[in-house]
């Protein structure tokens, strides 16, 4: 399948699949989407709600300086890299698990400009390291951030109450509807700890209903640039 590197509206690059007319990140801004969906409405909401405008206070047992995150669709590593930067900034420890069935090749990774666009040029080698470390083993990347990359299908996730946050960043339901089913979301529900959250860029009604049908409490939230809404699901 043909794969092109394209520039998005905020200046950051992503990978475009012409055959599917699908991108790894939003064409309206790869970095803006990642920050809004996964950091602001995910990590900040759970750990530092005061950073989220209009956020309600959370009880003490919902706050933690030791967070376990599962990413569904490790892809370019953008979400992992931004989360690493936030872990250092907020002084929180994160164990990050990135699941990817079809890893992106290093020749594509080397073309991406995320460290530059994030004003994190000094961490460019860290971004590369996220991709160079071996799969299926934990790696301490910084004092606050460890990563385990897992080369497997999303349907193979069978962990129980293991994660505080799930970044659900699979390709869209238009091109891969099998990734947005009740079966998948039941696995996600089981994998989350109590009061854990799942955040995703999608706001499709069928996705929201699939989440609700397996037990999630689902919120519609304002979306990133180019999207009216997104979803956050809580295991309560």
Describe these PLM feature segments.
Residues 1-46, 66-67, 85-97, 101-118:
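Rossmann-like AdoMet
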Residues 53-64:
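A cross-taxon signal for low-complexity, glycine/charged-rich
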Residues 65-75, 83:
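Conserved class I S-adenosyl-L-methionine
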Residues 110-159:
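S-adenosyl-L-methionine
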Residues 179-194:
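A short glycine-rich, Lys/Arg-flanked "PGG" loop and its adjoining helix->strand segment in the class I
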Residues 194-202:
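Conserved beta-strand signature within the Rossmann-like core of class I S-adenosyl-L-methionine
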Residues 214-236:
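Core SAM-dependent methyltransferase catalytic element
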């Amino acid at each position: 399948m043909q794969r092109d590197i394209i520039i998005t509206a905020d200046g950051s690059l992503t990978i475009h699949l012409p055959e599917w007319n699908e991108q790894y990140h939003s064409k309206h801004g790869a970095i803006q989407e990642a920050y809004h969906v996964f950091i602001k409405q995910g990590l900040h909401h759970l750990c530092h709600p005061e950073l989220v405008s209009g956020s309600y206070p959370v009880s003490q047992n919902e706050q933690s300086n030791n967070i376990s995150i599962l990413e569904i669709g490790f892809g370019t590593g953008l979400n992992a890299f931004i989360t690493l930067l936030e872990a250092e900034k907020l002084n929180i420890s994160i164990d990050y698990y990135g699941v990817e069935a079809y890893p992106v090749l290093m020749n594509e990774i080397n073309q991406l400009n995320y460290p530059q666009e994030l004003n994190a040029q000094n961490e460019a080698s860290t971004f590369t390291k996220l991709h160079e470390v071996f799969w299926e083993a934990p790696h301490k990347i910084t004092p606050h951030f460890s990563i385990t990359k897992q080369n497997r299908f999303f349907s193979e996730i069978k962990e129980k109450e293991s994660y505080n946050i799930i970044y659900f960043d699979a390709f869209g339901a238009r091109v891969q509807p099998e990734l947005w089913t009740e079966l998948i979301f039941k696995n996600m529900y089981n994998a989350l700890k109590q009061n854990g959250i799942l955040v995703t860029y999608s706001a499709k009604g069928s996705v929201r209903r699939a989440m609700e049908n397996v037990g999630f409490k689902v919120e519609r939230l304002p979306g990133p640039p180019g999207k009216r809404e997104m979803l956050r699901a809580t295991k309560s």
